[in-house]
Amino acid sequence: MPLHQLAIAPVDVSGALLGLVLNAPAPRPLATHRLAHTDGSALQLGVLGASHVVTVEGRFCEEVSCVARSRGGDLPESTHAPGYHLQSHTETHDEAAFRRLARHLRERCTRATGWLGGVFPGDDAALTALAAEPDGTGWRWRTWHLYPSASGGTVVHTTSRWRP
């Protein structure tokens, strides 16, 4: 349920530059939220500098960030690996729609179970939000990376599923 007001400028300032790397050493997050599965395993959501990392107890790691691009590759629209699937898409919103989405995500991070958010200084719509829940023997999660601009903003949204 945590929403963190971060005291650091975002490192990743363009959704177009995000990349994906799987199972690399996880970077140190600015904020985290740990979720327990009924089978005893745990997943950790992490906010990076306007990007994210999701880890499952040393068994799996997904990093979406600009740094990940140099270690893995561009963020694809869709990718598969054994037990894993990711989909991503990028949308541009006008000012009103972008602010509404940012407000909705901040509210979800504050009140809903399984959510984590980080708001960056200077604009309360400069936000990274993550939500996760158990999915059978594994996990599924969604992320939103919000990049404000003068006319609204860009949102990079991902959905992922992992099973051992």
Curated annotation (Swiss-Prot):
It holds the Pfam family DUF2617. InterPro entries: DUF2617. This is Uncharacterized protein Mb2629. It comes from Mycobacterium bovis (strain ATCC BAA-935 / AF2122/97).
